[in-house]
């Protein structure tokens, strides 16, 4: 009973949002808990996050003003693009990806889990994409820069060679020109940061 147009797994790169909803549904069935309860148990509590939660601002986008109090749809969240956070919470999550899955003193991901997230699964389709991460390579063809552009002008990134990461939030954002901000970060800002870090350390990573 395949949906019309469905292609075999691993045969094509086809980015979309429905797969995240399906993964969330599977997690709910396996654990017997709601997505909100799962996120609280495995992410919010062990990382001591203050704001981070999933909702569905897309159901009434005009009513969402970017604040936690205006978020709706927590009972049936949009998993692909429905999470909100502050900078402190986001920093904890990014740091966990750089520290082998450790968030403070609590492990939220196994080392194997972190590696699977960062594995390039679409190279044969001329794309560099893992599980949620877009992947860039160093001059010696080593994967090291993992980045993820958000729906509202945010781009998170980690540099596994240097052990650093960051988050860029864009105040004046338009989806029609989103690539300009992303390209600015990836091709201009991050190289400047890499150079500054290398210079400060007195050596290449």
What are the language-model segments listed below?
Residues 1-148:
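Short, surface-exposed loop or secondary-structure junction motifs
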Residues 144-146, 152-165:
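Short, surface-exposed beta-strand/loop micro-motifs that present aromatic residues
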Residues 117-119, 156, 192-198:
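A short, hydrophobic secondary-structure junction motif
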Residues 138, 176-205:
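Short, gly/Ser/Thr-rich active-site loops of penicillin-recognizing serine hydrolases
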């Amino acid at each position: 009973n395949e949906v019309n147009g469905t292609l075999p797994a691993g045969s094509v790169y086809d980015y979309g949002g429905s797969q995240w909803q399906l993964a969330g549904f599977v997690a709910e069935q396996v654990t017997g808990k709601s997505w909100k309860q799962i996120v609280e148990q495995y992410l919010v509590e062990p990382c001591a996050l203050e704001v981070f939660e999933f909702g569905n601002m897309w159901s009434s986008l005009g009513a969402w003003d970017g604040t936690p109090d205006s978020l709706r749809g927590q009972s049936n969240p949009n998993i692909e693009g429905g999470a909100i956070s502050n900078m402190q919470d986001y920093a904890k999550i990014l740091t966990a990806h750089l520290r082998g899955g450790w968030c403070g003193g609590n492990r939220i991901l196994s080392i194997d889990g972190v590696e699977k997230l960062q594995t390039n699964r679409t190279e044969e389709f001329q794309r560099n994409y893992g599980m949620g991460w877009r992947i860039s390579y160093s001059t010696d063809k080593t994967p090291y820069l993992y980045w993820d552009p958000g729906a509202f002008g945010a781009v998170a990134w980690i540099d596994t060679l240097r052990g650093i990461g960051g988050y860029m939030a864009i105040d004046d954002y338009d989806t029609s020109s989103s690539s300009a901000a992303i390209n600015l970060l990836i091709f201009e800002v991050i190289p400047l940061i890499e150079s500054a870090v290398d210079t400060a350390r007195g050596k290449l990573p």
